Amino acid sequence: MKVSLFITCVSDIVFADVGKHTVEILERVGCEVDFPAAQTCCGQPAYNSGYLQEAKKSMKQMIKAFKNSEYVVGPSGSCVGMLKEYPHIFKGDPDWEQPAIDLANKSYEITQFLVDVLGVTDLGSTFKGRVTYHPSCHMTRVLGVKDAPQKLLQSVKGIDFVELPVKEDCCGFGGTFSIKNPEISREMVKEKSQHVSETKAEYLVGGDMGCLMNIGGRMRREGKDVKVVHITEILNTHREGGIA
């Protein structure tokens, strides 16, 4: 099975190892992975800020970049969720509506692809540590991915998995929301940080890197010793003793 990696901006620039882990996981389950170098931003920041025409330029480039891909898989529910919005955005456009539908139909977040497409719920991973999971808003509400990440985490040998209280509450990031509404955002992430502390987890795991930056930043400012990691880092671990 051939899969094209949608790296996403934050993974490309900030969380470079997430791309590596994603590729290694896909290869472990028998996928042949390529990287279309012409890909760019999915257009979400511009779109959410009201710059529709500017956003469409990025979206058209993405459609062209992945035109020949069999499957498109990315390590972000938010960014993949944006690809799923393309058919709505290009609805009625004689040149771009069908290509937008084609891209949306073959695009998946990594855990969604593993569980729902490949039927993989156990990667044979080993990880020792107390872990809690934050389900991001876009992952759950836009993309509809709720069970797949936890199924995979709970299959990891040696893991001590604990549910996050009121787990589906927003962390306050929301892309440009945290910039436009900083006071509200700060209170939301403060509450999320408290919920993480209540679990006594050593690791906070998530599938969207914007959320991880936001929550991790808050916990560091509070002096909390909780490691914040992307789910692919846990799933691609084959040793006991956690992450250094």
Curated annotation (Swiss-Prot):
Alphabetized GO MF terms: oxidoreductase activity
Disulfide bonds: none
Protein's GO biological process: lactate metabolic process
One Gene Ontology cellular component annotation held by this UniProt entry: cytosol
Function: Is involved in L-lactate degradation and allows cells to grow with lactate as the sole carbon source.
Family, as annotated: Belongs to the LutA/YkgE family.
Name the UniProt record assigns to this protein: Lactate utilization protein A
Taxonomic source organism: Oceanobacillus iheyensis (strain DSM 14371 / CIP 107618 / JCM 11309 / KCTC 3954 / HTE831)
Organism placement in taxonomy: Bacteria, Bacillati, Bacillota, Bacilli, Bacillales
Gene name for this UniProt entry: lutA
